[in-house]
Amino acid sequence: NNTATVISAAPPASSAVTLPSMSPSPSASASEASSASETSTTQTTSTPLSSPLGTGQVMVTASGLQTAAAALQGA
């Protein structure tokens, strides 16, 4: 759980740096969505070996959500 929280703390920070002037609300929503997905994956994965893979997938999905948020902002 601690490792997942540390990993989850990194993507929102990068999204905030990537989209500072556009609008902070979409980045916050993206971070909330990523945190929700992380909690679901953490609950689903009970094996310690599968949890690192799950966190990696969460990282990818979080970046995807950030990209989608950026696309929505651009539109």
UniProtKB/Swiss-Prot annotation:
Description of how the protein assembles with itself and partners: Interacts with POU2AF1; the interaction increases POU2F1 transactivation activity. Interacts with NR3C1, AR, PGR and HCFC1.
Role played: Transcription factor that binds to the octamer motif (5'-ATTTGCAT-3') and activates the promoters of the genes for some small nuclear RNAs (snRNA) and of genes such as those for histone H2B and immunoglobulins. Modulates transcription transactivation by NR3C1, AR and PGR.
Cross-referenced InterPro entries: POU2F1_C
Name the UniProt record assigns to this protein: POU domain, class 2, transcription factor 1
Stretches for region Disordered: 1-56
Record gene name: POU2F1
Entry superkingdom: Eukaryota
Compositionally skewed regions (Low complexity) per UniProt: 1-52
Free-text description of this protein's post-translational modifications in UniProt: Phosphorylated by PRKDC.
One GO location term (cellular component): nucleus
Biological source species: Notamacropus eugenii
Keywords noted in UniProt: Activator, DNA-binding, Homeobox, Nucleus, Transcription, Transcription regulation
Cellular compartments annotated: Nucleus
GO molecular function terms listed in the Swiss-Prot or TrEMBL record: DNA binding
Similarity comment text for this entry: Belongs to the POU transcription factor family. Class-2 subfamily.
